[in-house]
Regions:
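Conserved active-site alpha-helix within GNAT-family acetyltransferase domains
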Residues: 95, 120-138, 142-146
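Short coil/turn segments at alpha/beta junctions that flank glycine-rich nucleotide-binding fingerprints
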Residues: 75, 91, 107-111
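Acetyl-CoA-dependent GNAT
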Residues: 3-80, 85, 98-99, 104, ...
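Conserved GNAT acetyl-CoA-binding A-motif
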Residues: 98, 105-117
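Terminal substrate-recognition subdomain of acyl/acetyltransferases
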Residues: 147-159
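Residues forming the Rossmann-fold NAD(P)(H) cofactor-binding site
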Residues: 91, 95, 99
Length: 159
């Protein structure tokens, strides 16, 4: 089983396919549906270095996951668009995406990583809690978010 995590251009066709699949899954899963125009922005341009990063995951040569980082001011970063294809879940890809993104974030000067998530994304919430994220008060007005988390990245070793 070969899993490769690498930086990608968020404007690439593979990145667009991953993000579209993520949006479609949210549309089908969330009680209120999902319209990306109504959520907190994470446009591809915001996920380009030096103020962002976009990672994709490949399993056996197929692009099966992604996540983005928005570098904000004062050492804050926000994890965005974390998604793994249903066909590749259970292989540890989300964990690898998260850990790899945290390592890149440290190199980019991020000291605290924040994220929000929906109550329907139970596995994601458990992933974040297992990896040291703690519940915080809402830091944005995302209408689809029910939980907000953060993790101090200071002290994480760079790769």
């Amino acid at each position: 089983m070969t899993i490769i995590i690498q930086a990608a251009d968020p404007f690439s066709e593979e990145a667009k396919r991953c993000i579209q699949a993520y949006f479609e899954e949210l549309q089908n899963l969330l009680d209120e549906g999902f319209n990306p125009a109504n959520t907190v922005s994470a446009d591809p341009a915001e996920l380009l270095p030096p103020s962002g990063l976009f990672l994709v995951a490949y399993h056996e040569g197929d692009c099966v996951g992604c996540c983005g980082l928005k570098v904000k001011s004062d050492g804050l970063g926000e994890l965005k668009r974390m998604w793994v294809s249903p066909s590749a879940r259970g292989l540890g890809i989300a964990r690898q995406l998260l850990e790899t993104m945290e390592q890149h974030a440290v190199k980019m000067g991020v000291e605290v990583m924040q994220l929000d998530t929906n109550r329907k994304l139970v596995a994601a919430r458990h992933l974040y809690l297992r990896h040291g994220y703690v519940s915080i008060k809402p830091y944005n007005s995302n209408p689809y978010a029910h939980y907000w988390f953060e993790k101090r990245l200071v002290g994480l070793s760079e790769f």
